Design a protein with these regions (language model features):
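NAD(P)H dinucleotide-binding glycine-rich loop of Rossmann-like/cofactor-binding domains
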Residues: 82-160
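Cofactor-binding loop segments of dinucleotide-utilizing enzymes, especially the Rossmann-like FAD-
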Residues: 8, 30-32, 162, 185
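Mid-domain Rossmann-like dinucleotide-binding core that forms the NAD(H)/NADP(H) cofactor-binding site
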Residues: 128-204
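Extracellular beta-rich ligand/substrate-recognition surface
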Residues: 3-11
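Residues that mark the start of a beta-strand
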Residues: 2, 24-26, 156
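Cytochrome P450 core scaffold surrounding the K-helix E-X-X-R motif
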Residues: 37-39
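Glycine-rich beta-strand-centered segment in the early N-terminal region that forms part
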Residues: 18-32, 42-85, 125-127
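Short amphipathic alpha-helix with an adjacent loop that forms part of the alpha/beta core around
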Residues: 204-210
């Protein structure tokens, strides 16, 4: 299969990369998104070598479950061992032996195919396009704010940052809170928030050396 993989120093396009050999569900990748985590991996995060990419929508090509074949799916990226206490409790993302799609010990979505356990996959209805479905994984990350904080409608909420994840978190917070201020440094990104009723503060200084 065609795949773009990271060898620890650079990204390489390989037109003859081996297909996934896991005894799992095989998914043909329709679309894959580029995440900030992917860029961090290029700078050494997780010391990962392999195929990057964990935001995807694809079509099931091979499965032990005939009903899954041909279905469009997105996937949870953490695959647990299914034997430890965390996995038994349904907390695979805390499994000490887990693999993480495109991040830890598991090839990702920047390829023609990927594989995941069927339990990690979620079927996408026809009413949702591939272009929308590819955002399911980052949107799920944004919804984790509800696990971390019990939001109250009367709260005044500040979101620091105007990147993609911050934008998604704001949309999640809007479901509960109406008084939201976003602090950011990119005027073009903040303008879109103003149109949706979000207050903005422009001028956060970057801490990056670049």
């Amino acid at each position: 299969m065609k795949a773009t993989f990271f060898d620890g120093k650079k990204m390489i396009l390989d037109k003859n990369y081996p297909n996934p050999d896991y005894d799992e569900t095989l998914v043909r990748v329709n679309l894959a998104g580029i995440c900030g985590t992917d860029l961090e991996i290029l700078d050494g995060y997780m010391q990962y070598n392999g195929i990057l990419g964990h935001e995807f929508v694809g079509t099931v090509e091979k499965s032990d479950n005939p009903e899954m074949i041909g279905k469009r799916v997105v996937g949870e990226i953490n695959a647990g061992c299914e034997k430890c206490d965390s996995c038994i409790k349904g907390m695979q993302r805390h499994c000490s032996n887990r693999t993480v799609l495109g991040i830890l010990k598991r090839n990702g979505a920047f390829a023609e195919f990927l594989s995941l356990p069927e339990s990690n996959l979620h079927v996408i209805p026809d009413s949702i396009s591939d272009e929308q479905a590819v955002f399911v994984e980052p949107l799920a990350a944004a919804f984790e704010i509800n696990e971390q904080v019990s939001l109250k409608p009367e709260w005044n909420v500040a979101v620091v940052g105007d990147g993609r994840l911050a934008q998604l978190i704001i949309q999640v917070i809007k479901l509960t809170c109406s008084n939201i201020t976003c602090f950011g440094k990119h005027e073009n990104k903040l303008e879109g928030l103003v149109q949706s009723g979000i207050k903005i503060k422009l001028g956060i200084e970057s801490t990056d050396e670049q």
